[in-house]
UniProtKB/Swiss-Prot annotation:
Coiled-coil stretches: none
Signal sequence, renumbered to the chain: none
Domain of life: Archaea
Major localization class: cytoplasm
One Gene Ontology molecular-function label: zinc ion binding
Disulfide bonds: none
UniProt xrefs under PANTHER family: NUCLEOTIDE KINASE
Free-text comment on this protein's domains from its UniProt entry: Consists of three domains, a large central CORE domain and two small peripheral domains, NMPbind and LID, which undergo movements during catalysis. The LID domain closes over the site of phosphoryl transfer upon ATP binding. Assembling and dissambling the active center during each catalytic cycle provides an effective means to prevent ATP hydrolysis. Some bacteria have evolved a zinc-coordinating structure that stabilizes the LID domain.
List of residues binding AMP: 31, 36, 57-59, 85-88, 92, 160, 171
Species for this entry: Methanocella arvoryzae (strain DSM 22066 / NBRC 105507 / MRE50)
Protein name, per record: Adenylate kinase
Protein's gene: adk
Region (NMP): 30-59
Annotated positions binding Zn(2+): 130, 133, 150, 153
A Pfam entry, by short name: ADK_lid
Amino acid sequence: MQFVLFGPPGAGKGTQAKFLSEELNVPHISTGDILRENVKKGTALGLKAKSYMDKGELVPDNLLIDLIKDRLSQPDCRKGFLLDGFPRTIPQAEALDEILDDINKKLDGVINIDVGSGELIRRLSGRRICRSCGASYHLVFNPPKAKDLCDSCGGELYQRDDDKEVAIKNRLDVYVRQTQPVLEYYKKKNLLIDIDGEKEIDEVTADVKAAIRKLA
């Protein structure tokens, strides 16, 4: 089975991706992993991508699409795949349609882990990091024993700038602007499966599982 996975920062997408990959026995493929792997191996596509990454530039669509096509053509994708981080735009979604046509596959579904902005801000803004050892805590989900102090080394805990509410809102705004048209694209194709990501992790997983079973 072939799926694409969407979810904003803080939605628990990584947890569900791990479950889905194991449940379906298919590889979890993220664009970040593909880029890192090709750069590490020094492939022709990887070297091209590295030339952009070294300059701090975005890897252009045509190169990213070639990398995706190459990865989806690998033997471990014969039984299916879980694609994460692609497509992010309508042209990329259309390119994915063409790739799948070329390899005689089709998407079974597009899973969107949906969480409201208020809950996402609560989840993301609660993170605290130790200045000394880098240990990570969360004021709600994994609080330190003593306020503002690291359990491991006693170092001071602080909130990173990108975990502050204004920065989080900006990240979420960018995510919504970027992905909403793509979600609409898949909704029109009757492929979109919205999952309530505000429930407990086990409940979200159960809902994802139920959605997959309906398609099997």
